[in-house]
Amino acid sequence: IKKNYKAKLDANFIYLPAPLDSKKFEKIDNIEKKKNQIIYIGRDSYEKGIDILKNFESKINGEIIYCTDSPWEKTMSILKASKLLIVPSRMESIPQVIKEAFYLKIPVIATNVGGISEIVENGTTGILIPPENPEKMIDAINNLLDDDLLIDQLTKNAFEFITKNFTWDVLL
């Protein structure tokens, strides 16, 4: 982002991403993971791609929980109990929910739109899927649900990335 604006405007910028307040997570209870529980967190809107997810829900080897209007602590408790987070967006900046999932060590499968690829590195911190590609999303979800080794690798890398780059302690 900084490079693009510097080139266009010939000005110096400081890129300050929205931080993650890791202290807020101390309030979230330890919850046992639910086998193959998948979570969607976001608005019920076209931009967020919730309709795409609902259209192929029956082809998923798990249960999708939709958190579209819940208080933050309740949503984070459900996220913490989930096996993975799905972000099927058509348009997006850098979703805070991905940072939250990284911090809670929940793997992320997201569409490669907007700023998502600035934090989700495909195969390293999460899985990126081309937008509007339900078949690839279905395959990625079902494959990841069955691959605990990959889940461990992704969540370890994602947690390390988020704590080194996006917490208040690092940014201040």
Task: Give the predicted meaning of each segment.
Residues I1-E26:
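Donor nucleotide-sugar binding/catalytic pocket of nucleotide-sugar-dependent glycosyltransferases
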Residues K136, N143, L150-K164:
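A short, well-ordered alpha-helix in the C-terminal region of glycosyltransferases
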Residues M76, P95-Y103, S117-E118, T124:
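Short alpha-helical segment that forms part of, or immediately flanks, the ligand-binding pocket
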Residues I31-K48, K54-E57:
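Conserved donor-binding/catalytic core segment of Leloir-type glycosyltransferases
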Residues R90:
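Aromatic "clamp/platform" in nucleotide-sugar-dependent glycosyltransferases that forms part
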Residues P107-A110:
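Short hydrophobic beta-strand element within catalytic cores of glycosyltransferases
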Residues S77-S82:
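Short alpha-helical donor nucleotide-sugar binding micro-motif in glycosyltransferases
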Residues N122-G123, I127-P134, N143-D148:
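Conserved acidic donor-binding segment of nucleotide-sugar-dependent glycosyltransferases
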